[in-house]
Regions:
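Helix-loop-helix "hairpin" substructures at the membrane interface of multi-pass membrane proteins
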Residues: 11, 133-211, 234-239
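Transmembrane alpha-helical segments in multi-pass inner-membrane proteins
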Residues: 15, 55-67, 190-197, 201-268
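Transmembrane helix-bundle core of multi-pass membrane transporters
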Residues: 83-84, 88-158, 185-188, 250, ...
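Cytosolic-side transmembrane-helix boundaries in multi-pass membrane proteins
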Residues: 110, 114, 170-177, 181-184, ...
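Alpha-helical transmembrane segments within multi-pass membrane transporters and channels
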Residues: 55-99, 106, 239-244, 275-276
């Protein structure tokens, strides 16, 4: 049981890292990026090809992949989101959803539907924690994801720049009056949120298969975590992501692996039934 609990905890840290990137974009810019899972897929393919062609381990290429995905996030904002912001909200929803479909289909064409995985990486093997053996890739990825989330929290809640983000999230017009550019902040947030999912995606390749639709499940779970934690709440998304990982692991251990995702959605429905704004949402 404790082995499953540990696995769920470290998987939950990865879910949390992906969810926090989505929550950051949603909370500051008031836009739901339905292509978030496909951004993770791009990051996984980037790390895979860095390893295959350049022999660069994903743990080492992760910062570069994060930068690349940050640029993808900037382009998405500059070319799509910015142009649609003054239109109906449904236009942006459909645009990001359509972008996800396009990216997934392009991946099918370019890389085929084959499942790919990396052989031995620098974090391959297992470690023993309190007498329980667990895969080293999951531990390393989970810990790096935790450090990344802590760094994001410090940036958002403990720096001047973070205060500017919160000001834009609270009231764009007032923020503009005091010299804060909402447009610049939005672009930076899209870059940062996309870089976060890029880092998580690169690290995932150390133990997870890479295929065109890999981002679908992770994107969906990130969306569930953000909604469950409280719309746009970074601490809420973080805690909900960990909770999802643990619930999945415990369901797989005590009930059946096939019901892992079902249990997450049952919990999701119960949380929103009791607290419609999520665990940390404002009433």
């Amino acid at each position: 049981m404790f082995e499953a609990l540990y696995a769920g905890l470290f998987n939950g840290l990865i879910y949390a890292a992906v969810a926090v990137g989505l929550a950051l974009i949603w909370g500051i810019t008031d836009v739901i990026n339905f292509a978030h899972g496909e951004f993770l897929m791009l990051a996984m393919y980037a790390a895979y090809w860095f390893f295959t062609l350049g022999h660069v381990d994903p743990t080492l290429s992760a910062p570069l992949v994060a930068i690349l995905l940050g640029f993808v996030g900037f382009l998405t904002y500059a070319l799509i989101i910015k142009r649609l912001q003054k239109g109906p909200p449904m236009a942006i929803i459909l645009a990001t959803f359509g972008l996800g479909l396009v990216l997934r289909q392009l991946a099918f064409i370019a890389f085929t539907p084959d499942y790919r995985n990396l052989p031995d990486t620098m974090v391959s093997g297992s470690v023993t924690l309190a007498g329980i053996s667990i895969g080293r890739p999951q531990v390393v990825t989970g810990l790096i994801a935790l450090l990344m989330v802590i760094a994001l929290f410090i940036l958002v809640y403990r720096t001047r720049w973070g205060h500017a983000l919160q000001a834009v999230a609270e009231d764009r017009e007032v923020a503009a009056l005091v010299g804060i550019s909402p447009d610049r902040v939005n672009a930076q947030v899209w870059m940062l949120g996309s870089a976060a999912v890029g880092l998580a995606g690169a690290l995932l390749t150390t133990f997870f298969y890479v295929f065109p639709s890999v981002g679908t499940v992770f994107g969906l779970l990130a969306f569930v975590a953000v909604c469950m934690g409280g719309f746009g709440s970074l601490p809420g998304a973080f805690i909900a992501g960990i909770l999802i990982g643990i619930i999945e692991a415990m369901t797989g251990y005590f009930v059946a692996p096939a019901l892992k995702t079902v249990s997450v959605f049952i919990l999701f429905i119960l949380v929103l039934w009791y607290r419609p704004r999520g665990l940390f949402g404002r009433w």
